[in-house]
Amino acid sequence: MVSMSSRMVEIADFPSVHLSNTRSLYVYLPPSYHENTEKHYAVLYMHDGQHVFAADERGGSWDMHVTADRLVSEGRMEEIIIVGIATVPHQRLNEYFHDNPRMHQVFDPPFAGERYESFIIEEVMPYINQTYRTLRGPEHTAMMGSSAGGIVTYNIGFRRPDVFGSIAVMSPYFVKAHFDAQGELKEHPFYERYGTHPNLKLWLDMGGAEGVFMEKYAREEAERLVRDGFVPGDDLMLFLDPGAAHSQSDWAGRAQAPLLYFFGDIGEPVSIKLYGDGVAGVNGPVKQLNPVITYDSGFVQTLMNGTYHVEDPELLTLLPDGTLKPRTPGSTRITLQMGSLIADKEITIVEELPELVKVTIQVKVPPSTPVSATIYAGFEIPYCGEGLYRGSAMVPHGLSFTFKVSRGFGLHEKIGDPEVKRRSFTASSEMELFYEVEDWDA
């Protein structure tokens, strides 16, 4: 057991020649760092550094120091140094987006991703290596980021596998998906694929209730990576986190998994569970199961291919990737076996499910809310007058949303009821929802 304490250091106003700005770096030094002065440590670099160890008015904390301390004290992970690289106000997307032709079709330039990459490799890393006792080389160097931080991690990892040997791409912003004024879903993929198989350990995930940050974007990229030569369960780990939202608290909740994958021992599988819709249509949207394996270390992953047994194959066939192929209405039980572990699930087949479900949302806001405010409740809700916002969208069947009503970017509702931490809904049938915002977080 480690009895010493880890320490935190802030390097304020760290300058960048490449980006012509300054920012803070937040450095976690592991428990033995100041006592064992001969020891050197692997390093994890993280984006959105202001949220890596603490919360602010724009978002919650990942509490990475807490997770790392716990895994080290349990003997599950080696001690590491963690470097949180803060964002610069109003420059986040600019710095996190590498330039490519697709990007210009979705966002307005400039895109400074290449310069941000150079800033990390040529300015931040030399400083960290000179200041702290680090292990050098890609086998000892990892990167982690979420959302837009996920896409910049993906790009840097594939562009510079000679520097970073492990990358955690969490809830990546690969596709700009939004509902237009008519409520129709528009999807614009804007990330660049590399089609290569570098010497890289890759963690890829997405939550099951992130709304338009859909599970399918992570799953589809994982399937492409397999075609590129990556091996699931070896140099590629996919996790589709059931019920998880697009938020710091959810990323914090699963950050232990990539830490174990990169720097520790994932342990042995102890259970498997089948997640996903229990209803599928002979006609309608394709449904796919999410088999989640849990390990004795707390590590988790989604099994990309398995051996399924269908009790009544006249009703349903099931592909190895968990895709349901309904044949005729009825109910049947499916079973997945992985070694000694078994999971089963009842599936009901109906004649038809709608591809899209109409969801109408009305939001009442406090009088202090500016009329010009942009309100989001899973998707953008238009102003309709007298402190009310109302809008409809045609949402893909089964898509789940978990969120707080927000005003613009980063300003969320303050929920007085301690039993209600976040709002949530799943588009299983036509619905009309009403939310009242009591107040906004300061």
Enumerate the predicted regions with their spans.
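Insoluble glucan recognition modules
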Residues: 1, 76, 268, 276, ...
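Short strand-coil-strand connectors
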Residues: 17-19, 296, 311, 337-341, ...
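Bimodal feature
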Residues: 25-26, 48, 295, 299-305, ...
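Short flexible loop/turn segments that cap and initiate beta-strands
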Residues: 37-41, 295-320
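Acidic, low-complexity Ser/Thr/Gly/Pro-rich repeat segments typical of extracellular/periplasmic
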Residues: 194, 202-205, 284, 302-310, ...
